[in-house]
């Protein structure tokens, strides 16, 4: 198919097959897959060379924005919206609309609800696409050797994977006591950025708090850190674990990268992280671990991770001089075959193409465990799904944010936990209201009511009232 597209481009006078395509991303652990696909693409499209630049995550947005403003943007790039929201990038003419290639038949290669106005489509035109299927983005990782050394095993010799808050507490207690100052039950790395909100995602969502660490509870449209008891209960649990010495002592100061290394060396038995950890650990020869997610007060989960339709990752620059060749690389990147190697060979994440996500076809057990968790991410409502004009609502971040507050709770600098959570709710709600007000003043028809879904059952998949294929 790609070959015929390029042949047609060449027949119409295009320069297909005689170009260097500049592409930017910030992926490091996923680099082996990207380089593999570039090699395959270049072999299949002789003469097109993909020149890849990997930028640091911390500087990518600034570099990308400068490149756009100086008319030196790469042909294909990973989308960054830290400074300029995607809808504004489209309005500024930074992104190339892809409709001359991404027609109805191309879009139907993807599952229903992959393309959504206000997310990856604007004015009915396609600008990006999802690469992955939504999945539980954070997991509780268990070092099997640490658990076995502590006697935390089942009758068959497998490790006792914690299912509840009490299970985690018991395991942390046993590991710490038997570790004699060499091994601890729990650990994390908070030195580079506040990472404790990740713990809220895993432990509080399962308790029935759909806002997790970031959003309002969309049943009411309100932020509920101070009014939802689950957040206070988890804060007390966190303080209890710390007070009893279950955490690796330097967790608050070491980086997440160092924490991952310490986990694989058995300095602590449990940590929170994402599937991106697995590739790094495999490179280091560490594969003896298990994982779970959504660990709540009870074994029966009262909430889930919630997904939205659509998705973005890569886009093509409106400045490109090689639109056909840039599209060819974009198309390859999002293809079923590339998705198959993404899942089954390189074990990176779920593919947007469901036929690639069969745990039985994955040989690496920890990644197969992750793929098998996909049912724990279910469709949820969203303001921008209900009203695409919500894309024009810009909500400014607040400080101190949840990560800063949790760090203060952990270190003991914050004594009034309930008051800190309630103050956070007030500031977050104010920022949301201000964002909506500013969008209204700009002429956009948005409302705080867009954030309220009173009939939402958080234990069941939400049915979106949007076209499956626009």
What do the predicted segments below correspond to?
Residues 1-92, 154, 161, 337, ...:
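Conserved N-terminal structural module of periplasmic/extracytoplasmic solute-binding proteins
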Residues 43, 70, 244, 283-355, ...:
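Extracytoplasmic/periplasmic substrate-recognition and gating elements
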Residues 54-63, 83, 162-167, 250-264:
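Short helix-initiation/N-cap motifs at beta->coil->alpha
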Residues 82-139, 290-293, 466-470:
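Hinge/lid segment of periplasmic solute-binding proteins
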Residues 99-112, 156-161, 207-233, 283-284, ...:
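Short, solvent-exposed loop/beta-turn-alpha elements that line the ligand-binding surface or hinge
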Residues 122-134, 138, 148, 166-223, ...:
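Extracytoplasmic/periplasmic solute-binding protein
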Residues 167-173, 215-252:
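Glycine-centered hinge/linker elements that transmit conformational signals in sensory
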Residues 292-294, 344-411, 445-470:
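Long, aromatic- and glycine/proline-rich binding clefts that accommodate carbohydrate-like moieties
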């Amino acid at each position: 198919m790609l070959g015929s597209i390029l042949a047609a481009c060449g027949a119409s006078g295009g320069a297909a097959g005689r170009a260097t395509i500049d592409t930017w991303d910030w992926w490091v652990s996923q680099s082996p897959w990207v380089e593999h696909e570039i090699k395959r693409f270049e072999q299949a499209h002789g003469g097109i060379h993909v020149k890849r630049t990997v930028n640091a995550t911390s500087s990518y947005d600034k570099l990308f924005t400068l490149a756009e403003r100086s008319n030196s943007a790469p042909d294909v790039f990973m989308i960054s919206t830290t400074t300029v929201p995607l809808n504004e990038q489209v309005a500024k003419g930074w992104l190339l609309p892809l409709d001359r290639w991404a027609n109805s038949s191309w879009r139907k290669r993807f599952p229903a609800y992959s393309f959504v106005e206000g997310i990856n489509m604007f004015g009915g035109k396609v600008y990006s696409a999802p690469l992955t299927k939504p999945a539980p983005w954070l997991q509780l990782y268990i070092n099997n050797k640490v658990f076995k050394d502590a006697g935390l095993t089942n009758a068959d010799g497998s490790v006792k994977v914690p299912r509840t808050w009490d299970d985690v507490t018991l395991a942390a207690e046993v590991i710490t006591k038997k570790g004699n100052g060499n091994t601890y039950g729990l650990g994390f790395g908070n030195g580079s950025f506040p990472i404790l909100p990740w713990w809220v995602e895993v432990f509080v969502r399962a308790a029935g708090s759909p806002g997790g660490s970031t959003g309002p509870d969309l049943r009411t449209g309100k932020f509920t850190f101070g009014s939802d008891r689950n957040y206070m209960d988890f804060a007390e649990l966190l303080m209890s674990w710390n007070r009893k010495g279950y955490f690796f002592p330097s967790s608050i100061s070491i980086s997440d990268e160092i924490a991952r290394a310490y986990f694989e060396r058995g300095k602590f038995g449990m940590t929170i992280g994402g599937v991106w950890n697995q590739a790094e650990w495999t490179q280091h020869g560490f594969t003896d671990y298990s994982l779970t997610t959504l660990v709540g007060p009870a074994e029966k989960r009262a909430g889930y991770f919630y997904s939205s339709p659509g998705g973005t990752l890569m886009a093509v620059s409106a400045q490109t001089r090689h639109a056909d060749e840039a599209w060819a690389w974009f198309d390859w990147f999002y293809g079923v075959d590339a998705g198959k190697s993404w899942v089954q060979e390189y074990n990176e994440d779920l593919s947007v193409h469901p036929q690639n996500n069969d745990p039985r076809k994955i040989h690496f057990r920890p990644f197969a465990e992750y793929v098998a968790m996909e049912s724990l991410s279910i469709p949820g409502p969203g303001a921008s799904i209900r009203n695409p004009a919500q894309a024009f609502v810009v909500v400014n971040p607040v400080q101190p944010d949840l990560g800063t507050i949790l760090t203060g709770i952990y270190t003991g600098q914050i004594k009034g936990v309930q008051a800190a959570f309630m103050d956070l709710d007030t500031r977050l709600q104010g920022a949301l209201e201000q964002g909506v007000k500013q969008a209204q003043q700009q002429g956009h028809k948005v409302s705080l009511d867009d954030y309220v879904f009173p009939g939402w059952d958080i234990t069941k998949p939400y049915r979106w009232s949007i076209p499956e294929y626009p």
